[in-house]
């Protein structure tokens, strides 16, 4: 990619080598690393003798933010429960590991009065969206549910959880609002970290329909592994979402700070307070095994 440009929010950024970037440094610059594999970049910078005091990764910032992340209270929009007591989750690919099975059983123990729905290729039409179908046929399971979970919540209402979420407390108090989600350590909303809504919520439909405009398989045959966070941000930014880890309502959706889900996945950091409903461990099934092993 060196020599090409990366387009972000309509701005073009030239991609250069680390050596060239250091040459452009006038001594007043700070390098902010946004890549997941920030440790490797640190190593490369140190080889060139770069002043590491002027270098930091967004993941380390997120780790520090998680320690102070907070919000006043869960929002109540009604005296009556609005979101139905339904918990949805998805599983594609091989048989669920025992750890995942035990985790789901733990949900059921905490929420005996909830209805649980497992969605997979036997009870859901994965061909109804091109992006989802391409991810399924490519066996890149971590992307298959991105469209599906929005479609399910829009149609039936309830709460969606990724299977690598450990529930800390029963989510009853979350049911008195029309729609909720949370930020994660990327400082933007992550629907994989759990979200809920009443059926027919407009913002859920818009987030779902966005996937009709993108493909998972690029024209050159490579995979479009843009995260669901980035896809969601493309929708939410036009409604004024702020990247600040603060509780905010965006087009009817209450988005809670990252402490709501208690984890900074890229640094393997967990922090739980009385404001944490569950921990999203983020097994990052969409990330290559090689990079996960390095971390």
PLM segments and residue spans:
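Structural motif
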Residues: 29-30, 86, 159
């Amino acid at each position: 990619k060196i020599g090409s440009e990366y387009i972000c929010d309509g701005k073009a950024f030239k991609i250069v080598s680390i050596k060239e970037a250091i040459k452009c440094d006038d001594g007043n610059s700070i390098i902010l690393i946004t890549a997941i594999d920030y440790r490797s970049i640190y190593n490369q910078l140190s080889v060139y003798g770069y002043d590491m005091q002027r270098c930091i990764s967004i993941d380390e910032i997120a780790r520090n933010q998680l320690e102070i992340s907070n919000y006043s209270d869960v929002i109540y929009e009604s005296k009556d429960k609005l979101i139905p007591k339904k918990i949805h989750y998805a599983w594609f690919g091989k048989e669920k590991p025992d750890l995942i099975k035990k985790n789901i059983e733990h949900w059921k123990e905490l929420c005996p009065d909830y209805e649980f729905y497992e969605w997979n290729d036997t009870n859901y039409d994965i061909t109804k969206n091109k992006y989802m179908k391409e991810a399924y046929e490519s066996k890149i399971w971590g992307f298959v549910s991105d469209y599906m979970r929005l479609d399910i919540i829009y149609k039936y209402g309830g709460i969606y959880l990724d299977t690598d979420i450990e529930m800390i407390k029963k989510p009853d108090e979350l049911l008195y609002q029309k729609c909720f989600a949370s930020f994660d350590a990327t400082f933007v909303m992550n629907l994989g970290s759990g979200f809920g809504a009443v059926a027919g919520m407009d913002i859920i439909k818009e987030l779902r329909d966005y996937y009709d405009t993108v493909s998972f398989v690029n024209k050159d045959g490579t995979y479009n592994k843009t995260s669901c966070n980035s896809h969601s941000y493309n929708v939410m930014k036009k409604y004024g979402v702020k990247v600040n880890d603060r509780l905010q309502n965006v087009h009817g959706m209450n988005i809670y700070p990252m402490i709501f889900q208690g984890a900074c996945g890229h640094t393997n950091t967990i922090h739980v307070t009385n404001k944490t409903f569950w921990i999203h461990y983020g097994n990052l099934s969409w990330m290559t095994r090689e990079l996960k092993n390095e971390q």
